[in-house]
Structure formats: structure tokens, C-alpha cells
Swiss-Prot record:
NCBIfam families the record matches: PRK13668.1
Name by which UniProt lists this protein: UPF0354 protein BA_4944/GBAA_4944/BAS4588
InterPro entries: DUF1444
Family: Belongs to the UPF0354 family.
Length: 270
């Protein structure tokens, strides 16, 4: 049998077939690239060189190249995961629950409108953790949740502030992909609660913003409702157009007629 670059490509693809790897063949340069699907990191194999080795060592040449490629890709993957951080991300309850059929994401309930997912972030790549990835990482769901919340608490925050009609609005927008995630930082929420004199209202209209408001009158409720709707419509990854009253660690959704609820509460007190 005469070995050609095309035949060698087929032989290597058979030996290196794994669901997490992709193959790209450049017929002009006679190069086969094997790379990780998620990170796009990979190895280029010059096929004429492997064919020349095959002429001398036959099957052993193919085995050696396949082994080298496999070990290199596995090492890349381990290095990437060791540098990666697991962080929680906030998504709408309408966000898909599965990566694909039979492979659910790791999730935690948050509010009536939001759910917590978990991302493996290595700065260059960002992937939501599903059951298959969980197995590859060798972690339990509990470990993922604990690591994610620990890392969320390490995220910095610096708010911009605006006051309208006596109501103060604090905006966090670092565009690091985790602005909404700061809603899970209990110490941050408590520190804001201490400086707020009225109702503490929190909103995560999309992934890249966290709004905390000190609402002291009905106009404030109208403003936060309009503001949240606007941010929700403009967001790259929208979450919810509703905002929440935060009290004692709980989030109560505010509906469009929140100001009417406030009026009713006032009459009952009277």
C-alpha cells in the first residue's frame, strides 16, 4: 500500500477521534490541525513528515504521532482549567436549562425571575458548566457552587451615583461580564442597605449592569421601572425587566403597579 498525505490524515483522525476535538485539513499545505472545540487551541501536524516516518516504521510512526498530539492537547486542557475560574452568572428563568438534550446545565434557583448558572472562565473562553463538563472537571455540584460564590465575593465594585426627585440610584457597569453577578455578594448588599434610608430596590436588567436604588417616594418607583425596562431592552444578554425590593436577604419582585401597592399600604396603615 502506498501511503499518501490524505490517507495519513484519515488514519490520524481515526486514532484521535474524540467528541471534544475538531479536525481541520489544509490540502494545499498538507497539514492536519487537531484542536479543542471550546478553546480553539491545538496542534498542527505536517503530514508529509509523518508519511516519511511511516515509510520506515509503518504503524509505529502513526502511533507515536497520535500519542504526541493526544498528550499535548490533554496538557493544554489541564493548563487551561487550572488557570480558569468558576463564577456564577445570572440568567432569566426562560434561559435554556440544557446545553443539549440529556445534558443539563448546573443551576440554582435565585428569584421568581432569575436563576444562577455557573461559568468556567479562563479569560479567553467562557463556558456555562453542564453535567458533562462537571464530570471532566472532576467536581461536585456543591463544590462548583461554593467556588463560584467565593470568587463572586472577590469581584470589585465601584458605583456611579445619580439622584432624581430625592431618590438615589447606584449603577455598577464594569463590563467584565459579571456585573449582574454582584447581586450574589451578600456583604455588598448589606453595606448598601446600611447607607439607604428608604426602600432598597435592586435590578439586574441585563448581564452587564447592577442597579441599586434608594427609593423614598412614588416617583422613584416609576423611575426605576422605566430605567429597568430601558436597560433590559438594550442589553446584550437581557435578564429581567422587573426590579426587586431587597429586605432581610430576600428579593420581592416589583410589578408595574408597584406605586399603587404603596398607596394601598399607606391606606391600610392609616
Amino acid at each position: 500500500m502506498k501511503m499518501t498525505s490524505k490517507k495519513m490524515k484519515d488514519e490520524l483522525m481515526k486514532k484521535l477521534s474524540r467528541p471534544e476535538w475538531d479536525f481541520h485539513y489544509d490540502s494545499e499545505k498538507e497539514v492536519l490541525r487537531i484542536e479543542q472545540k471550546d478553546s480553539k487551541k491545538g496542534i498542527n501536524v505536517s503530514l508529509p513528515g509523518v508519511v516519511a516516518k511511516w515509510e520506515v516504521n509503518k504503524e509505529k510512526a502513526i502511533e507515536e504521532v497520535a500519542y504526541y498530539v493526544q498528550e499535548a492537547l490533554i496538557a493544554m486542557h489541564k493548563e487551561e482549567n487550572s488557570a480558569a475560574k468558576i463564577l456564577p452568572v445570572i440568567r432569566s428563568t426562560s434561559f435554556p436549562k440544557q446545553a443539549e438534550e440529556g445534558n443539563p446545565f448546573i443551576m440554582t434557583d435565585h428569584t421568581a425571575e432569575t436563576r444562577i448558572y455557573y461559568a468556567l472562565d479562563s479569560n479567553k473562553t467562557y463556558r456555562l458548566i453542564d453535567e458533562r463538563l462537571l464530570q471532566k472537571l472532576g467536581l461536585t455540584e456543591k463544590q462548583v457552587r461554593e467556588m463560584a460564590l467565593f470568587n463572586a465575593r472577590s469581584l470589585g465594585y465601584e458605583f456611579k451615583q445619580d439622584t432624581v426627585a430625592g431618590n438615589t440610584f447606584y449603577f455598577l457597569n464594569t463590563n467584565d461580564g459579571y456585573d449582574a453577578t454582584r447581586i450574589l455578594n451578600e456583604s455588598l448588599l448589606q453595606s448598601m442597605r446600611e447607607k439607604i434610608s428608604g426602600d432598597m430596590v435592586v435590578a439586574v436588567p441585563h448581564q452587564d449592569v447592577l442597579i441599586i436604588a434608594d427609593i423614598v417616594n412614588e416617583i422613584g418607583y416609576d423611575i426605576i421601572a422605566q430605567m429597568t425596562m430601558k436597560f433590559f431592552a438594550e442589553g446584550h444578554v437581557p435578564i429581567t425587566s422587573l426590579s426587586f425590593v431587597y429586605e432581610d436577604g430576600d428579593f420581592e419582585p416589583i410589578f408595574i403597579l408597584a406605586k399603587n401597592r404603596k398607596k394601598t399600604d399607606g391606606k391600610e396603615k392609616g
